[in-house]
Amino acid sequence: MQITEKETVQEEQQKLLYPPPSFSTKCHISSVEQYNEMYKESIESPNQFWDKKAKEFLTWFSDYTTVQHGSFEKGDISWFLNGKINVSYNCIDRHLKENADKVAILFEGDEETMVKKVTYREMFEEVCRLSNLLISLGVGKGDTVAIYLPNTPTAIYSMLACARIGAIHSVIFAGFGYESIVSRVHDAKCRVIITADEGLRGGRYIPLKEKIDQVVQHCKLVQHVLVFKNTGRPTITFNPSIDIWADEAMLDHRPYCPPVWLDSEDPLFILYTSGSTGTPKGLVHTQAGYLLYAAMTHRYVFDYHDSDVYACMADVGWITGHSYIVYGPLANGATTFIFEGTPLYPTPARYWEMVQRHKITQFYTAPTAIRSLMKFPISFTQQSDKSSLRVLGSVGEPINPEAWRWFNTNVGEGRCAIVDTYWQTESGGHLITPLPGVTSTKPGSATKPFFGIELQVLDSKTGERLYINPDINGCKEISGVLAISKPWPGIARSVYRSHGRYLQTYMTQYKGHYFTGDGVKLDSDGYYWIEGRVDDVINVSGHRLGTAELESALVGCSICAEAAVVGYPHDIKGQGILAFCTLKEGYQEDESNVIMMLKKEVRNVIGPFATPDVIVITPSLPKTRSGKIMRRILRKIGCHESSAEQLGDISTLAEPEVVKLLIEKVSKVIPKTH
C-alpha cells in the first residue's frame, strides 16, 4: 500500500490502493467476489444470511423461531425472536473446554511494568464470584447496575457478571464529572454502583470513589457501592453502611454461578450518548443481535485468527470499548488487550513499545491519537519492532488523509491493511468499513458498507434518494445525509424509558430510514466519505458531545448569562469546541480569569474531555429578531468562512454588527490553517 511522493494529495485520495495478494489469501474473506456475494445475500435474503451467521457465531440454549421482525417506521425492530441465550456464556464458558488456559485479557497499566494476563479459566472464576456477590445484594434479571471504573480487567469482569445474571449494566466513562454521573445513575435507576478507589492515567491519580461519594448523596436510590482496590492507596473515605470492599467480599462467594438464560431481546446494557437536546440518551442494546454483530464485525473487519493478539486503545466507557475490547473479541475467543494509560506517557513511543512487547497483531485507535503522535519526531515510532502488526484500525471520527498516510507508512510500514471504520453507539458495530485483503482503500474514505447495511444518500430537504448518473447530468459524486434503509441485528432498540425520543431522533426525519445524523459524500467508485454531523452534536476526539449539554454547563456558572457552542476544525481532535459566552450584567473581571472559571465549570459538570478549546466573551450573540441564536453564523465564523458570500443573509439578525466583532475576536484565537 505504498504511495509515491510525486502524487498530489487529491490524486492520493482518489487512487485505489490495492491489498497485496499474499495478504488476501490468508483472510476470512479473501476476494472482492466473496464480499460481493455475501453482501448481496445479506441485502436480498437477510433472513437466510443472518440465520446462518447466528448459528455460526453464537451458542444458543434454545433456538429462535423467527429471524427478524419489525420496521424503522414502527420502531419495533427485533431479531432472533424467542431464542434463549446468555452473553457471558458465549464470551467465557463455551471457550473453556478447549481454551481454558488461553489468555483472554492482556492488560497493561499506566506504567509498563503493570502487566497482567488473565486466562479464560481465571476470568470465568472472577466473573462467577462477582455474579454471586451481586446476587447476594439482591441484583437480578432486569436490574440496572452502574459501572464507574478505570480501563482495567475489573471493568470487563463487571460487565460480564451483569450479563451472566441478566442485570443491565450502564458503564459510565471514568472521565465524566459528578453531574454527568448523577444524571446517568438517576435516569437508569441504578441501586448498585461498581467503582474503584482511583484510576491511574498519564502519571496522575484519578479520584473515582470520591466522585461516587458525591453521587450517592444525590441519588438516594443507590443502596450499595462495590469498591475495588485499583491503586490501593489509603486516600478514600469508607462508609460501611453502603460501601463494600469488593475484592474481599468476592472471596466469600463460589467461583461458579450458572448463567441465566435470557430472551434474545432482553436488554444487555444501557450506554448514554450525547443528544442535541442536551439530555444524554440511554441507548438500549439487547442480547443476541448485538453480540452477533459485535462478534461478526470483529472477526471480519480485523480478520481475527486464533493466534492473534488483538488490541483496541478505546475505553470501556464508550461503545468502542464495549464492542471491540469486550464483547466482540471475547465472543470470538480472542486475546483482547486493554490499556489504562495514554499514548504519550511516559513518552510518545508508548503505543509502539506495547506492540513490540506483546506482539500485537491488530491495533485499533482514534485519529486524534494518531494526529497527536504525528507531532513528535519519527524516531519515537521507528525505535520499536512493529513487524507483528497485520491490521491497523481507525475509529471515532473520519481520519484525514494526512493522518491515514502517516499511519500506513510509519506504523504499518506499507504492508498492513488499514480499516477506517465508521459506526455509532446506536449501531452496535461497524457500518462502513474496508475488509482486510479485500477492499481497495482511499485515504480518508470509510469505503464500503458492511454486510446487511443498505446505505442511502438522501437530499436533506426533500428526503429523496440521490443518484450518481454521469451519463445524464455529468454528476460524478453526490453529497447528502446518510441514511440506512434496512434494520441490522446490532442496532440499539430504544432509548431507556423514552421510546418516543428514540423514534423522534432516528426514525421520523426520513420515512422508512434510519437517520445517522451525518453528512456523506458518495464518489463514482461507490466509496463513502463521512463529512461530519448535521445535527447539534460535536465529535471531539471521537467523543460525541451535545452542544446543548455544553451550553447548559456554561450557563450553570454564576457569571455566564448565555452561551452558544459550535464545533470548529482542529488539527489534532478533528473538531474543537468553540464557545461564545455573554456575562451577567454588571459583572466585571479580567477576561482570562473569566475564561478560566468557565472552563473549570465545564470540567466539573461534564468532565475534562469536554473543556472548550476556545471561549470567546462577547457582549451579545447573533440572534434573529425572534430571539433565536443563529448557530449557522457562529459555525461559519469558527471555520473562518466570514466573507459576505460565505455568511449569507444576516439582515434578519437583531444586531448584525455583532458578527463583525465576533469575526475579529475569533481570528485572534483560532489561527487559519489554510
From Swiss-Prot:
EC number: 6.2.1.1
Any one of the GO BP annotations: acetyl-CoA biosynthetic process
UniProt KW keywords: ATP-binding, Ligase, Nucleotide-binding
Gene3D superfamilies on file: 3.30.300.30, N-terminal domain of ligase-like
Catalytic activity: acetate + ATP + CoA = acetyl-CoA + AMP + diphosphate
InterPro entries linked: Ac_CoA_lig (IPR011904), ACAS_N (IPR032387), AMP-bd_C (IPR025110), AMP-bd_C_sf (IPR045851), AMP-binding_CS (IPR020845), AMP-dep_synth/lig_dom (IPR000873), ANL_N_sf (IPR042099)
Matches recorded under Pfam families: ACAS_N, AMP-binding, AMP-binding_C
Superkingdom, natural source: Eukaryota
Protein's recorded name: Acetyl-coenzyme A synthetase
UniProt organism field: Dictyostelium discoideum (Social amoeba)
Protein's gene: acsA
